[in-house]
């Protein structure tokens, strides 16, 4: 493995790890950075699956205590049963719409204008959600009802539109539906586990012919890097929201959306590769 290839894998692993669970759209960042460092082609599809899987495994590791507790208590404890049911309920809408419309959305909406508009609109909605008067009825994830879970699951479906951000959609949805920042953020992380693992398994099977033994070192660099930086991002976000709102992320989304429009308008980024990400 050449040093430049290793460097590319490292950089993209950092980008994936830092942006996957922040409400700022990891897809848009990956497209721009991949173009800047010249990383593309069929290997990029397989590589993206690997680093996304690493990011979600970082969340699994970070919340391993809660996961173990739920699994242990599932046969007998009502709270664990309700939490699991809420995850399944929230996961279901994305499964249905993903099966029905994923390819169609990827074909028609994966373009710089859609990504940029989704970022800007999402940023504006996030600002509004933060500034409106909060009536919190679920301080912790264990306080959520099945109706909360279903509404957040429907909100997650908006993330099928490129640039929306899965974490952004679920966190904003949680805030609008009466969850505290902590509960909305943590449930977003938990919901990411089945959602992203399912997406990775589906994509891995779809592109199974692209996984080659000679690419293993590149995948390993990206995997480890994404795992480490995803863990850093998750811990930092949980600490950040304890004393701050999501306004900073909202303004960043708006600025980033305008940047994407500029890169497209002035042909600074090869957005023809967007559909490959």
Swiss-Prot record:
Entry GO MF terms: undecaprenyl-diphosphatase activity
Membrane-spanning intervals of the chain: 47-67, 85-105, 108-128, 183-203, 218-238, 249-269
EC number: 3.6.1.27
Alphabetical GO biological process terms: cell wall organization; peptidoglycan biosynthetic process; regulation of cell shape; response to antibiotic
Pfam families: BacA
Membrane topology of the entry: Multi-pass membrane protein
Signal peptide per UniProt: none
Keywords assigned by UniProt, alphabetized: Antibiotic resistance, Cell inner membrane, Cell membrane, Cell shape, Cell wall biogenesis/degradation, Hydrolase, Membrane, Peptidoglycan synthesis, Transmembrane, Transmembrane helix
Keyword Disulfide bond in annotation: no
Subcellular location: Cell inner membrane
Disulfides per UniProt: none
Recorded catalytic activity of this chain's protein: di-trans,octa-cis-undecaprenyl diphosphate + H2O = di-trans,octa-cis-undecaprenyl phosphate + phosphate + H(+)
UniProt GO cellular component terms: plasma membrane
NCBIfam families, sorted: PRK00281.1-2, PRK00281.1-4, undec_PP_bacA
Family note: Belongs to the UppP family.
Protein function: Catalyzes the dephosphorylation of undecaprenyl diphosphate (UPP). Confers resistance to bacitracin.
Other information: Bacitracin is thought to be involved in the inhibition of peptidoglycan synthesis by sequestering undecaprenyl diphosphate, thereby reducing the pool of lipid carrier available.
Protein name: Undecaprenyl-diphosphatase
Organism encoding this protein: Pseudomonas aeruginosa (strain UCBPP-PA14)
